[in-house]
């Protein structure tokens, strides 16, 4: 199950506030999630760890979610998925991967999303989608000998550098801008050095 930086923020906050030994997002990611490479440029995401032969979510205890109040966006929206559009809206997709899960009364997509896809989550998803292309582009321009440095900035500003006692979205926006500035400068320096080599 994917866990984005908004999910990591709220899951960490929930665990901290309910008596867990988890106090920061880095601890949460280390204990409960695994990074997965999304693109060869180095862009990675996190997925929640699983346990057992059936790859059960690490937070599922006795067939109940132990973090129900802070569960990941993908869990809240299931069996639907969200695909942001360039026009600023969303397409809602229906997962048919596990048909046996879908028994019971019919659900209207509009009502499901209104209940489970908050205004903050909508704003976050749109802004993350809008910036992801530029982040990937800059990462591709950065040479291998500086890629580790770039990815440390990526990890810090996408996932780690948050104060759990302040609103998430404002911090996310600030971190995104910082990350784009840093990666742009690293990519620009590489482009400039190549130009200088030709003179």
Sequence positions of predicted segments:
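Short loop/turn segments that flank or connect secondary-structure elements
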Residues: 1-199
């Amino acid at each position: 199950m994917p866990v984005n930086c908004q999910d990591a923020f709220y899951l960490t906050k929930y665990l901290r506030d309910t008596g867990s030994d988890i106090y920061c997002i880095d601890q949460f990611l280390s204990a409960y999630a695994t990074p997965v490479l999304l693109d060869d440029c180095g862009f990675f995401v996190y997925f929640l760890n699983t346990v057992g032969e059936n790859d059960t979510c690490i937070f599922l205890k006795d067939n109940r979610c132990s973090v129900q109040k802070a569960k990941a966006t993908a869990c809240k929206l299931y069996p639907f998925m969200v695909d942001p559009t360039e026009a600023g809206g969303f397409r809602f997709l229906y997962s048919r991967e596990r048909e046996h899960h879908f028994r019971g009364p019919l659900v209207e997509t509009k009502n499901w999303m209104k209940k489970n896809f908050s205004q903050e989550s909508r704003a976050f998803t749109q802004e993350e989608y809008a910036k992801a292309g530029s982040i990937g582009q800059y990462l591709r321009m950065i040479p291998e000998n500086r890629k580790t440095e770039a990815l440390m900035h990526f990890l810090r500003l996408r996932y780690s550098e948050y104060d759990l006692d302040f609103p998430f979205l404002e911090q996310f926006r600030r971190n995104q801008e910082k990350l784009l500035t840093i990666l742009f400068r690293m990519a620009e320096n590489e482009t400039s050095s190549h130009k200088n080599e030709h003179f």
